[in-house]
From Swiss-Prot:
NCBIfam families: PRK04424.1 (NF003359). The lineage of its organism: Bacteria, Bacillati, Bacillota, Bacilli, Bacillales. InterPro entries: HotDog_dom_sf, Transcription_factor_FapR, WH-like_DNA-bd_sf. It comes from Listeria monocytogenes serovar 1/2a (strain ATCC BAA-679 / EGD-e). The gene is fapR. This is Transcription factor FapR. Transcriptional factor involved in regulation of membrane lipid biosynthesis by repressing genes involved in fatty acid and phospholipid metabolism. Keywords: DNA-binding, Fatty acid biosynthesis, Fatty acid metabolism, Lipid biosynthesis, Lipid metabolism, Repressor, Transcription, Transcription regulation.
């Protein structure tokens, strides 16, 4: 692996983050062959915020006006892509406040909340309520893992104000949750 001077590394770091604002400090450290602490110091020197803040910024700039069914700050997880009535993706980092203290396993309601709020966000109406949900937890999620939830809207089968949204949540390539959400929706009068 090529060693970069501090100046070169910082320039390449800035480019890498501009190209992919969702890259982690750990991935950057591996890419540049330095410690995570060195990456953090470089980010601070360049006034580049940590990953969580970068994600919030991208989401608020790109999706704040797109989501109609609930305020963007009420979405559990960070929306990184959304096409109303079609699909959406969000990420959720499991931290210490989301897990059972004794075994560091994420509490199920956090996984459900991420999936349910994503199913709500993908509905293009001002009112979107979950009428029924069928959820299967496939495996436990641990502190420090990142959950990527992907929602897909099924094509409408009739004119009812009910839409079915399928959500699958992953840690890496492994499914951790599968859910089917029946969403009632309407436009406020």
């Amino acid at each position: 692996m090529k060693k970069y001077s501090k100046k070169d590394r910082q320039m390449k770091l800035q480019v890498a983050i501009e190209e992919n604002p969702f890259i982690t400090d750990e991935q950057l450290a591996e890419k540049f062959g330095v410690s995570v602490q060195t990456i953090r110091l470089d980010r601070v020197a360049l006034s580049i915020p940590e990953l969580r803040e970068r994600i919030k910024h991208v989401a608020s700039v790109n999706y704040a006006d797109a989501v109609k069914s609930l305020p963007i700050d009420e979405v559990i997880g960070e929306i990184i892509d959304i096409q109303l009535s079609k699909s959406a993706i969000s990420i959720f980092d499991v931290r210490s406040e989301h897990v059972f203290k004794r075994n560091k396993i994420a509490r199920g309601h956090h996984l459900f909340a991420q999936a349910n709020s994503l199913a709500t966000a993908v509905i293009p109406n001002e009112i979107a309520l979950t009428t029924q949900a069928t959820v299967r937890f496939v495996r436990s999620v641990n502190e420090g893992e990142r959950i990527i939830a992907k929602a897909k809207v099924r094509p409408a089968t009739d004119n009812r104000a009910i839409t079915i949204v399928d959500v699958k949540s992953y840690v890496g390539d492994e499914i951790v949750l599968k859910g089917k959400f029946e969403m009632y929706h309407a436009t406020q009068k």
